[in-house]
Structure formats: C-alpha cells, structure tokens
C-alpha cells in the first residue's frame, strides 16, 4: 500500500489499543494545528454541530497532516454525496452521526466504497485523496485504509445495536451521550444512573462483537469510567469548551465576584 494511504488510527483500533482524542469545534486550521501539536492520538473535526464547510474541513486536514495526531471527520449527516466530498478531500476516518438501523449502516458503507463494492463516485484524479492522480492504483488500495465509525445515539439505535454491529465494513461504534440521554428521556443528563448503565452495557456489547467502542466525555472522571468499561477511542474534551473554561479561570483570578468556569452542559 502507498505510504500516503496508511491509517495508523485504524491499525491501532484493530490491535485493540486505547487512543485518546480531542473534539475540534473551533472551525479553524490554526486551532487544529495547535491541537495537533499537543500529542492527542486523534482529533475529531466536527462538521455536525460546528459550522464547518467542506473547505474548512479540507484546510484543517491540511493543518494536521504533518503531525502524528490522526484526523477523524464527522460530516453533518451520512448522505452518499457528502461522504464522497469528504473522502475526496482526503479524510480516511469518518464518524457518521445518527445511524439508527443496520440498513443505514450498510448504505454508509456502500457510500465509502468504489464499485463493484459500493457506490462512491469516481473522481480521484482531481482529488486530494489520491494526490490528484499521483497515487497509483488508488481505487484498488483505498478500501483497506478507510476507517468507518458510526454513532449510536438514540433508543432506536440501541434496539438495533446487534444488527448494526453485524454490518461488514463498520470498524467501530461511537456512543453519543448527549443525544442518547435525551432520546431515553433524560435530556442534558448523561450522568443519570440509567443512562450510565446503558452506556456501560453498550460499550461492552460493542467490544464483545469485535468492534471498537468510542465515547466523548468532557468530564475526566467519566472518560476514565468509559475506559474502564472497555471503550478504546475516547475523546476527553472539546477545544471550544476548554478554551472558554480557560478564559473564565483566568478572568476569575483578577475580577472580584468571578468564581471560575460556568456550567456549560454535558456537551
């Protein structure tokens, strides 16, 4: 395989290694590069809740490329046309939100594969992914380097988890705590004991099926708990939340009546 197509993030998942990540919601290549120099194993570049365009995602991929931190792109949804664009700009690992059924999971897999294995549109000669046609036999090699992660974040998805885990081409399943807790009737309360129980059992089911299990935890104790349950790709913070907390803490040192960071929700 061409060295440009190697995917260290996927290789480490296959080995069952734990990888610690950071969520990037700031939408700038400058902030992405700062994060990449910190040494996180992976960086989630968010196109679902952060206002990133395809060009924004592209520039952030360029910014982190020289560093060891591995980029993961989350598009706003899992449509075939959007997945095609994100792959063409050079993303190798995708996190697809709101996957509720095995059929949805199969459609997402198909969108990432070239024919005859899927429906990805052919345009590598004009795309960064193939270095504008300079990677020989790109189409024959790329499937092995792509890593596909799907988010389970609703009661419906939980009911269908075993079927989703059976879909060939899914490398890992990410538990979305904020949407999941809301779907279960505990909005903005991912720490509720029932939600915690479901998160634990889901992580254990994912790992038992031979897939990687992922999670985002903005509280360090929750991140440690998920790691103890077996999650092996865990994001331990969000750049914008860490930035705003740091600003509040610094201001509190010099302004009377300021008590440090305000509560900003579970995500």
Curated annotation (Swiss-Prot):
GO terms for cellular component: cytoplasm. Belongs to the HpcH/HpaI aldolase family. KDR aldolase subfamily. It holds the Pfam family HpcH_HpaI. Catalyzes the reversible retro-aldol cleavage of 2-keto-3-deoxy-L-rhamnonate (KDR) to pyruvate and lactaldehyde. The keyword Magnesium applies. Binds 1 Mg(2+) ion per subunit. It is an enzyme of class 4 (lyase). Keywords: Lyase, Magnesium, Metal-binding. Transmembrane segments: none annotated. Homohexamer. The active site is at 49 (proton acceptor). The keyword tRNA processing does not apply. Its cofactor is Mg(2+). Mg(2+) binds at residues 153, 179. The record marks 74 as: Transition state stabilizer. It catalyses: 2-dehydro-3-deoxy-L-rhamnonate = (S)-lactaldehyde + pyruvate. Its EC number is 4.1.2.53. This is 2-keto-3-deoxy-L-rhamnonate aldolase. The record marks 88 as: Increases basicity of active site His.
